[in-house]
Amino acid sequence: MSKKIEIKKLVEKYGHDFSKYPRPGKDLIQYSGPTFDTSEFEAAIDVLLDGWFGLGEKAEEFELQTAHALGKEFGVFVNSGSSANLVALLTIRELFKDKISGSRNKVIVPASSFPTTVNPIIQLGFEPLFVDVEFGTYAPVYDQVIAALERHDVIGMMFAHPLGNPVVQTKEYYEKLNKAGGFLIEDCCDCLGGKYLDVPVGTYSHAATLSTYMAHHITSGEGGMVCFNRKKHQRIAKSFRDWGRGCFCSGKDVLSVDGACGKRFSCWIDNNVSDHRYIYERLGYNLKPIEMQAAIGLVQLKKLEGFVKARNNNFKHLGSLLSSIEGEVHLPYSSEFVTPSWFSYPITIKKESLLTRDLLTKSLESKKIQTRTFFAGNVLKHPAYQKIAKSTPYSLKNSDLIYKNTFMVGVWPGINFEAIEYIADNILSIVSGDNT
């Protein structure tokens, strides 16, 4: 038996042990996590045994397939979803440099967001214009967005499809911004596999981003993707990812004398430097993942349809079990004309309720049910954002309540209906006051 086959047999044994449903009351029911079997382990081992760790053929295929899953043509694999947002806005800023000015630099963004959907806006010199979100869908408040889009100082919009619930007005926002010479970036980190108007999330935007962190719909361990419809945009993004380098060759052929393009020493830049492998056109970063992550991601993509089905089935089942407590809480729902790909099950305690989030989450955690808040909730409530807290003209009352009263539990494929029913039973017991 060859060493490679022997290793794969051991990996297969471990992989089968890895994928088990939690036992309610005995094992932790996570809010999310990776769903693996032996195929992911084998894909990773193949890359390790091949000996090429840098980005190569697996990464290029992963970029292409992920881009198509987000309604785009070209992808750039990066080391996280947060990096994807940064690279997306860096690329857009370069492309829209003639339209951005001191009097037109505001970017619309929901106040209830993940921090790194907001942070690149601030870090790259734009001014965030915060809008509120709706209870239930957690989408940006439509009237506020429309009012903001009519302002002369707005250049763009950046938002996440909240917790796997596509924003149905995305196409409308994109068309308004496009007509006005502005841009839209869709953060699809929580919504891979979701659709609006029967097309994938990511379709109606100038750039779409994704996270492949372990908690998300597919995983590569860590990782992210930024996707575009034009090759030029992909090359700009790759340059920002790869230290600002002008060369876009990739794969094992970069080790050849003339590079993967065969023109390494062709002097195509007029600066008296003949080796274009080391020409830097931008102030870039090192945001590269590795080939092994792409190999895992490709296997996960093949399972996406099943993952989405499991998430949505778990979500629907939990919702049916909790319908009796709608007087106390806002339960989540999707808008008409969208197909969700639920990341989690968010619950917001109503303002008039005597319940508290602390009571619910501490009680659930004591029963081995993992909970999370709605990420940052209203980001403006956090210390890092205090200096920009006065930058919005709109009421953020819903985001304020989400900051204090919203939590979420899991619906991911790693839990089954038995776990879902255990979650529901415990929530109902707490709400009824019978938490024994």
Language-model regions: role of each:
Residues 59-64, 72-73, 81, 101, ...:
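PLP-dependent aminotransferase class I/II
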Residues 57-106, 120-123, 130:
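Phosphate-binding glycine-rich loop
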Residues 112-118:
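Conserved coil-to-alpha-helix start sites within the AMP-binding
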Residues 124, 179-181, 367:
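Helix C-cap/helix->beta junction micro-motif
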Residues 1-53, 182, 281, 410:
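N-terminal "arm"/small-domain region of PLP-dependent enzymes with the aminotransferase-like
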Residues 136-220, 225-235, 408, 412:
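Active-site phosphate-binding strand-loop segment of PLP-dependent enzymes
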Residues 117, 127-137, 372:
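Short beta-strand->loop structural element characteristic of the AMP-binding/adenylate-forming
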